[in-house]
Amino acid sequence: MDFQIISRFTDGGDFQWTKFGTAAFLAVLLSALAFLSYTPRVHQKSPAFTSHKLPFIGSLGFTTEQWKARNWWKRATAESKTGNFSFWLGQRHVVGVTGEAARKMFFTHEALDFVSGALIRPINIHFWPPIHDIFRPDSKSRSKNTYFLRRLYELQSTEQLNHYLPQLLKDARVGMAGLSRVTKPSVSCWETVFTQDVRLLCTDEIVADSKLLATFGRQVETLLFTFSHYNVCFPWLPSPSYYKRRQARYALYNLMEDIVNKRLKNGARGPNDPVQILLDYNDKVDHIIEFFISVLFIAPANSRIIGGQMLNIMSIYRDWQEKVYADIKAAAAAHSPDKNAPLVDQLAFIPLHAWENSFPSIDLCLQETIRMWTSFSMARLNLSPNPIPIPGSDEVIPGNTFVCYNSTEVNFSDSLYPDPKKFDPARFLDGREEFRNEAYGFLGWGRGRHPCPGMRWAKLQQNIIIAYAVAMYDWSSCDETGKPTPQAVHVKELNAARGTVLPSAYCKLVPREKV
């Protein structure tokens, strides 16, 4: 009987098979469309959905548009009666919030999880598949901190920073000495930033092997620069960036696993570096490897941007460069035993506490740079099954739902930062500080329940790099041939497709003294 059925089906030859193939394709296509078009039910008090969306995909503008005149976020806000709105990313329901009260709630509510928010940020897709336990609160810890946070804080202790300070200073000096006399800081400062991060937060073993360091660097750069907007909407969708990120992560895991396993096999205690410290704690090997992969991705993510922009700023705003130079000379004079030695040599005698507290002009420029360059949408996930009321409205963030806030709203507010597109570090001086007129008016270094856990090292790193750069060279803005560009200004391009892309600005370096 089965044979007869098959015979009848195959009568007509290729034509019948063509019809079967077409029918099968249409069935799969219709099933896929039915799945994509399925709209999950949402809480009745969710903010109204924005009309700015595409079939099946949802609001792709969330990931592709920043803050230009009529961008997606502004249009969605404008058509909302409350300033809050809902939108889809594929089949994920997301709530967007605006305003001071909602901003405070976004940063302080205990049910809103920072790490899970990474799942709808393009750069973080597939980095933790799923989110690893090292980023989850540890019930055995008194502080309830995650494994990742506990270990990161320990590696930034005064003892650790003092131990590594001489080498970190040497890394900065070597990195600055290797710069071309016409350079693009957005690219050229990467190697110094990454070398210091690896040394302090992972192991000297990698830094000592230039090929191994370069291999780690390439894989981390792949994770930093390769992502897909569409994978935010369709996490399961294969794409070139999906595979590149997976391969890079796999390579990093294997590289780090080799280092850890060699220590374990040798039996003898290794050098007192972060790898050995975590092994001495008898931490799980998987936790150790995952920690180092993650920290080497996270640490340089913003430092490379801020470091490159700070050097551009030194070349454009030469009045601020002179203020920074004066601070450097004052700090060196206060601690160097040889006042006649070259300034760059004197820097080696500055102790840790002075490196952290003796550069007020760098700190002002750093705050202004962070304000301008950390302007993008941020995300959290309501981990609870219960809705969270949105202050100032009758709306809620449903349970198990993502919520976003765009920091450009506050960072480029005319009332909090008069003439916000202007680079003006003096706005952070006593007597100004207009941003204090609202809760969380300055979002640099994180706020609320999620302050930046790497802030101590991040600030110290910028102080060291900028101090060596300015001590060694006079910086000025130029084009790629070295021709001066005196009309150059520092601008955060709000119309760019990506919020973290640095402008192609060049700088001319003139050595200040012979060493």
UniProtKB/Swiss-Prot annotation:
Glycosylation sites: N84, N406, N411
Membrane topology: Single-pass membrane protein
Primary localization: membrane
Record's keyword terms, sorted: Glycoprotein, Heme, Iron, Membrane, Metal-binding, Monooxygenase, Oxidoreductase, Transmembrane, Transmembrane helix
InterPro entries membership: Cyt_P450 (IPR001128), Cyt_P450_E_grp-IV (IPR002403), Cyt_P450_sf (IPR036396)
A Pfam family annotated for this UniProt entry: p450
Residues annotated as transmembrane: 20-40
Biological process annotations from GO: biosynthetic process; sterol metabolic process
Subcellular location: Membrane
Phenotype caused by lack of the gene: Impairs the production of neosartorin and accumulates blennolide C and 5-acetylblennolide A.
A molecular-function term among this protein's GO annotations: oxidoreductase activity, acting on paired donors, with incorporation or reduction of molecular oxygen
Binding-site list for heme: C452
Recorded metabolic or biological pathway in which this protein acts: Secondary metabolite biosynthesis
Enzyme Commission code(s) on record: 1.14.13.-
Cofactor annotation: heme
GO cellular component: membrane
Chain's role: Cytochrome P450 monooxygenase; part of the gene cluster that mediates the biosynthesis of the tetrahydroxanthone dimer neosartorin, which exhibits antibacterial activity. The two different monomeric units appear to be synthesized by the same set of enzymes, among which the Baeyer-Villiger monooxygenase nsrF is the key enzyme for the divergence of the biosynthetic routes. The pathway begins with the synthesis of atrochrysone thioester by the polyketide synthase nsrB.
Protein family according to the UniProt entry: Belongs to the cytochrome P450 family.
Name of the protein: Cytochrome P450 monooxygenase nsrP
Species annotation: Aspergillus novofumigatus (strain IBT 16806)
Gene name as annotated: nsrP
